[in-house]
């Protein structure tokens, strides 16, 4: 979704949303892509800054059931929703997430990020022995060979320090206040999704 074509809601669109059971702390903080079709947004509460993409496509489910993209039965707080995404039956809320295009999110309890998070990057994990001393900082790009170097080349302290600094720098660049759900992600029948970055085409289902 490009922010270049987002706009504020028109008064008649707000009226349509309210007829659909939607509420907002402040409608001025809600932006939408054009054309906006309010009929695809029902029983949603908005708070904070929320941006909505287009709702123009349908999803075909196993058995031939079709569901139109849109948002139904959810609370959104400080979120950006991409084009042609379906969010349906969020029992609590989604807070501080950027959600990509063509995502399918259904029957989720809660999704949130609170405060700054590195999303698991640069978290040290003990390896080889349970008493510590050979911790490896994990991060998104960690390979088996790099973990081997960090764990077993402690006799090369300069090398270890450089690798640790590289990982710390990567983690700092990943740190932020918003979680990220990539394009074409499916999250179905899931309890809590917190402090998460999901890449495109991933699936979380229980």
What is the predicted function of each stretch?
Residues 1-184:
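Terminal amphipathic alpha-helical/low-complexity segments used for targeting or macromolecular assembly
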Residues 196-203:
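Conserved small/polar residues in nucleotide/adenosyl-binding loops
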